[in-house]
């Protein structure tokens, strides 16, 4: 039986989102959530969770290239804890190193500079985070 997973690419201004299935190991970008200093519209997040009913939620963990934590790492952990606390969802953290760089590269290849919109980058980053989790997680 497959697992439905929802992924978030946490950011202080925008939070990317993607939905995916473990059977295919693929993800599809959803519209990004606007955030103010890392605080999302929690009603919009709740609506998304109710609509998609994920078995698990994945939050990208921003780490430095050497694996050490950075300022945004703590904020992403806090976001993950709030998701779990507010909505009772099963949350996992996934290393997201280089996902934004890879997302920009993929979007640029498809549509050039005009395609490089922040919300689109965040959504593709969330897809990459989720697909990485499908590949490496033991569920």
Swiss-Prot record:
Keywords: Cytoplasm, Hydrolase, Nuclease, Ribosome biogenesis. InterPro entries: RNaseH-like_sf, YqgF, YqgF/RNaseH-like_dom, YqgF/RNaseH-like_dom_sf. It is found in: Cytoplasm. It comes from the Bacteria. GO terms for cellular component: cytoplasm. Disruption phenotype: Controversial; it has been found to be non-essential. Has also been found to be essential. The keyword Cell membrane does not apply. GO terms for biological process: rRNA 5'-end processing. GO terms for molecular function: nuclease activity. Its EC number is 3.1.-.-. Could be a nuclease involved in processing of the 5'-end of pre-16S rRNA. PANTHER family: POLYNUCLEOTIDYL TRANSFERASE, RIBONUCLEASE H-LIKE SUPERFAMILY PROTEIN. Belongs to the YqgF nuclease family. NCBIfam families: RNAse_H_YqgF. This is Putative pre-16S rRNA nuclease. The lineage of its organism: Bacteria, Pseudomonadati, Pseudomonadota, Gammaproteobacteria, Pasteurellales.
